[in-house]
């Protein structure tokens, strides 16, 4: 039974680590998208 619990904890740690990495990447993409949108808006407004 102890082996099962240790495997379960390792699986949970892996899942938790993956979830945190996905969350970090989503935050980075969100920031990049906001910056790109802002730069495009400034570029378009500068033409007028």
Swiss-Prot record:
Pfam families: DVL (PF08137). Signal peptide: none annotated. It comes from the Eukaryota. InterPro entries: DVL, DVL_RTFL_regulatory. It is found in: Cell membrane. Residues 13-44 are annotated as: Required for DVL/RTFL small polypeptide activity. This is Small polypeptide DEVIL 22. It comes from Arabidopsis thaliana. Small polypeptide acting as a regulatory molecule which coordinates cellular responses required for differentiation, growth and development, probably by restricting polar cell proliferation in lateral organs and coordinating socket cell recruitment and differentiation at trichome sites. The keyword Nucleotide-binding does not apply. Keywords: Cell membrane, Developmental protein, Membrane, Transmembrane, Transmembrane helix. Belongs to the DVL/RTFL small polypeptides family. GO terms for biological process: negative regulation of cell population proliferation; shoot system development. The chain crosses the membrane at residues 7-23. It is a single-pass membrane protein. GO terms for cellular component: plasma membrane.
